[in-house]
Regions:
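A short beta-strand/loop micro-motif in the catalytic core of glycosyltransferases
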Residues: 453-456
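Aromatic- and Gly/Pro-rich donor/ligand-binding loops
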Residues: 310-448
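Iron-sulfur cluster-binding cysteine motifs and their immediate structural context
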Residues: 1-14, 218-219
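N-terminal, charge-rich interaction modules
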Residues: 18-53
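Long, compositionally biased charged/polar accessory segments in the mid-to-C-terminal portions
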Residues: 47-50, 153-309
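Short, flexible loop segments at boundaries between secondary-structure elements
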Residues: 127-148, 426, 430
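Glycine-rich phosphate-binding "P-loop"
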Residues: 63-91, 426-435
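Cysteine-centered iron-sulfur cluster-binding motifs in ferredoxin-type domains/subunits
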Residues: 1-5, 35, 110, 201-208
Length: 456
């Protein structure tokens, strides 16, 4: 059944028709964007059909449920930025389909593909709608956020994309049972801060093969972000939906319902190019976030992973193609990790005469998690930003203080670019020689730098 493993035939159009639509203001006020979902749902319910979409459950997890009345549509409206549990809903939908009921299924493209894979047959009474999905965070993320921020037992409702300030992407209201309300925006809310930089993105969502054209559903719907760049009159700040009509069956339906929209304009397909496409990468510290989430609070996990904050910054020539360098630095990294320190590995800048390598050339695969290795700096000047990443700076072993190697290694081993308020530590660093080739001025400068170390 898994659509990732069993790709079903997709004969949707490679050049779908694209429309910018607005339902009446009352519907749009209750909707995340332009009200396209409500118009499509009403079309099916008025024919005694059923609608299946995502709704909040009692524990503030999201489940796909089936509704049969217009009065139940509010359960399915508005975006829910968390993965929906499908559970047994495909099985239930098949029963409705085989009874001849008209069925509308709305979900992420992968969920639409999953339904089609499960059914293994084309039903004329099935209408599928895939959403423009950025990505869906794990329920674990939402659960921990709500529990730590409010206590789940205190929450009455969670509503994303409230529109009383306009059509904005990052508004969420958390209403508590004591009637208090917290308005969450990206500037004041840890969940929003992590979501919008793709900190929670699953690896499988990065190269989603279901997000491209031809799409999975008969229709594709979502926010028509940036439509004003092409057609300013199609954004009145109350919400505009982008609808893709992906096949002839969908076109026949759309011609029936388009008169129910307050505004319905066909636009060029290029207008929706800013919507989700394959190849969108997760935040580089995604795995670091999930590690921190297991160790501590949600808020700290977001702040530290988003901003690249670590317990220790370890500088050294650990990418040098030398068994001693690579093994001793890995050993030091592992010991620190075993002591429950989160360590960021930093190498020489690219401007060093003896520049760093990409990765660890003598290991078949890098032994470090991707989040533990900082991308190479272009110059020493750029490395000043490391002061924002930790309060402890550690220089490791090898002849890093050898005078004849100081300049070839980029002149960074004495941490003179690190603020004196930070803790500086040298572990097994050496001069590598019994004699010193430097001038008296070099001796004095090196002495000053070494005196700023807290421990050697």
């Amino acid at each position: 059944v898994c659509p990732q493993l069993n790709t079903s035939l997709n004969d949707n159009w490679k050049d779908p028709e694209c429309y910018a639509v607005m339902a009446d203001d009352d519907i749009r006020t209750k909707s995340s964007s332009g009200g396209a979902f409500t118009i499509l749902s009403n079309y099916v319910l008025e024919q005694n059909g059923v609608v299946c979409g995502a709704a909040w459950g009692e524990e503030f997890e999201v489940h796909h449920i089936i509704v049969t009345k217009k009065s139940e549509l509010p359960l399915l409206r508005r975006s829910k930025y968390v993965q929906s549990r499908i559970e047994y809903v495909y099985r239930e939908l098949k029963k409705y389909l085989e009874c001849g009921k008209k069925v509308l299924f709305v979900g992420c493209p992968c969920q639409v593909a999953g339904l089609k894979s499960y059914l293994k047959a084309k039903y004329q009474n099935l209408i599928t709608v895939d959403l423009y999905c950025n990505y869906t965070p794990s329920p674990v993320v939402m659960r921990k956020y709500l529990e730590e921020s409010y206590g789940k037992e205190n929450i009455d409702s969670v509503e994303f994309r409230i529109k009383d300030e306009g059509w904005i992407a990052d508004i969420c209201d958390v209403k508590l049972k004591n009637r208090a309300k917290k308005r969450c925006r990206e500037f004041n809310d840890s969940f929003q801060q992590g979501y919008h930089v793709r900190l929670y993105m699953r690896k499988v969502c990065e190269d989603c093969k279901f997000a491209d054209i031809p799409r999975q559903g008969d229709f594709s719907i979502g926010d028509f972000w940036w439509i004003e760049q092409y057609h300013p009159e199609l954004n009145d700040q109350k919400g505009t939906s982008c609808i893709l009509v992906n096949n002839q069956e969908a076109k026949d339906i759309f011609e029936t319902i388009e008169s129910q929209f307050k505004v319905c304009e066909r636009v060029e397909l290029k207008c929706m190019e800013n919507n989700r496409k394959p190849g969108v990468k997760a935040h580089r510290n995604r795995d670091y976030f999930y590690k921190l989430l297991q160790e501590g609070s949600f808020k700290d996990a977001v702040e530290k992973s988003k901003n690249g904050i670590y317990d220790i910054v370890l500088w050294g020539n650990w990418s040098e193609k030398n068994y001693g360098s690579e093994l001793t630095y890995y050993a030091l990294y592992q010991v620190l990790s075993d002591l429950n320190y989160n360590v960021l590995m930093v190498e020489r800048p690219k401007t060093a005469v003896w520049g760093p390598n990409e990765g660890t050339p003598l290991f078949q695969t890098t032994p470090y998690p991707s989040y533990a290795c900082h991308e190479l700096y272009k110059s020493k000047d750029e490395m000043i930003e490391l002061n924002e990443k930790s309060d402890i700076f550690l220089v490791g072993s090898d002849q890093i203080w050898h005078h004849d190697l100081y300049k070839p290694f980029g002149e960074v081993c004495y941490f003179d670019y690190i603020y004196n308020s930070k803790k500086k530590i040298a572990y097994a660093a050496s001069f590598g020689r019994e004699y010193w080739n430097g001038t008296e001025e070099d001796v004095q400068e090196t002495t000053r730098d070494l005196q700023k170390f807290d421990f050697i």
